[in-house]
């Protein structure tokens, strides 16, 4: 069976219109899928019975199912999805979260995954501990939004591509999903409510700059010099800071939007005053905001978050250099909301069950 959800409007078969005018039924079907967030084809009540039967027999409507749901004391919800392939990915729903640019907000933000695992091997991250397995399809990316809304009984209105995987390494499916998410016939979420976070794939940043959508960009920097960044982010060997920051400058110039430099603070690794001073120079060059993220510990990794004094000192250096700076107090700390942790627990559970079955 073919997946129904990743179809673009102009890809839906013309015979669905049943002679009732261009795009008539296709728009109805798209509205049921993306606007009304139908849970099944059977809910599409204004379609003819023969058309519903055809859709049910020829198309697969469910790209993923909920495997685990964890709630945090701060109302963050972490969702673990099982894909039809048997793989797992995570999404995180963050109610009433402040936006990345410092404003207060009552939005419901959803953090999306784009890959099963990750190939980029950032030393502090749980997503890459099991390596990269495959890219998500556009349908699997969009389904995270629709199924989260159904599970939480709320409408998501802000998206951040900061979950498992490197979004720009799955560029074609990312752009296809964005087309569906942003389109009036699709999920209808405006581009200015969408942020893509990247570990620093310079060519794809330049390609994204040429796209018409006014999407926000967040760079996972985490080190202000090649020496420090290279220790914890292997991608820096392929795209060192000079090349990466030049690509970001091109993006900022073409889009005219403030971008964010994300910086996870790790005790004794990247939290020195010298790193803060160099980071401030990068931020001023790009006219960027800095989002400091005290490290969210990951089981099996030895990194630690700095103490409050070191965090405040680092932020003070940036603010003293007139760089807009926020310190993000991680949400979902009590539910392992750092990328990939819930998936790793599920994989260990499955492995234990398999050993017992054997």
Descriptions of predicted regions:
Residues 36, 98-99, 128-132, 225-226, ...:
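A short, flexible beta-alpha/helix-coil linker loop
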Residues 93-94, 173:
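Residue-level structural signal for beta-strand termini and adjacent loop
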Residues 129-158:
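Conserved alpha-helical substructure of the radical SAM core
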Residues 77, 89, 107-112, 120, ...:
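Generic beta-strand structural signal
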Residues 1-89, 95, 249-258, 263-358:
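Auxiliary Fe-S-binding modules of radical SAM enzymes
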Residues 147-158, 163-326:
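Conserved AdoMet/S-adenosylmethionine-binding subsite of the radical SAM
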Residues 98-140:
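Canonical Radical SAM [4Fe-4S] cluster-binding loop centered on the CxxxCxxC motif
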Residues 91-92, 102-104, 231, 351:
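Short, charged, solvent-exposed linker or helix-capping segments at domain edges/interfaces
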């Amino acid at each position: 069976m073919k997946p129904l959800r990743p179809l673009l409007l102009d890809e839906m078969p013309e015979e669905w219109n049943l002679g009732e005018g261009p795009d008539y039924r296709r728009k109805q079907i798209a509205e049921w899928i993306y606007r009304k967030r139908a849970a099944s084809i059977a809910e599409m009540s204004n379609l003819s019975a023969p058309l519903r039967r055809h859709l049910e027999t020829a198309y697969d409507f469910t790209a993923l199912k909920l495997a685990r749901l964890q709630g945090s004391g701060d109302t963050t919800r972490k969702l673990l999805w099982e894909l039809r392939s048997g793989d797992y990915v995570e999404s995180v729903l963050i109610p009433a979260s402040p936006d990345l640019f410092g404003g207060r907000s009552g939005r419901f933000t959803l953090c999306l995954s784009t890959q099963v695992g990750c190939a980029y091997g950032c030393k502090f991250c749980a997503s890459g501990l099991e390596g990269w397995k495959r890219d998500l399809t556009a349908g699997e990316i969009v389904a995270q939004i629709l199924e989260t809304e159904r599970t939480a009984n709320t409408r998501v209105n802000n998206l951040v591509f900061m979950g498992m995987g490197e979004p720009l390494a799955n560029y074609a499916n990312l752009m296809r999903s964005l087309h569906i998410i942003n389109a009036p016939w699709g999920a209808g979420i405006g581009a200015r409510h969408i942020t893509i976070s990247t570990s620093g794939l310079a060519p794809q940043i330049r390609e994204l700059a040429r796209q018409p959508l006014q999407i926000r960009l967040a760079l996972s920097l985490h080190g202000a010099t090649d020496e420090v960044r290279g220790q914890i982010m292997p991608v820096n060997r392929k795209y060192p800071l000079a090349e990466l920051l030049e690509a970001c400058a091109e993006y900022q110039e073409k889009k005219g939007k403030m971008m964010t430099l994300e910086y996870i603070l790790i005790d004794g690794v990247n939290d020195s005053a010298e790193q803060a001073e160099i980071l401030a120079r990068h931020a001023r060059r790009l006219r960027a905001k800095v989002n400091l993220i005290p490290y969210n510990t990951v089981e099996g990794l030895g990194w630690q978050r700095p103490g409050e004094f070191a965090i405040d000192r680092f932020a003070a250096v940036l603010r003293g250099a007139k760089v807009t700076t926020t310190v993000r107090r991680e949400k979902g700390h009590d539910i392992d909301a750092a990328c990939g942790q819930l998936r790793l627990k599920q994989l260990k559970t499955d492995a234990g069950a398999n050993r017992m079955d054997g």
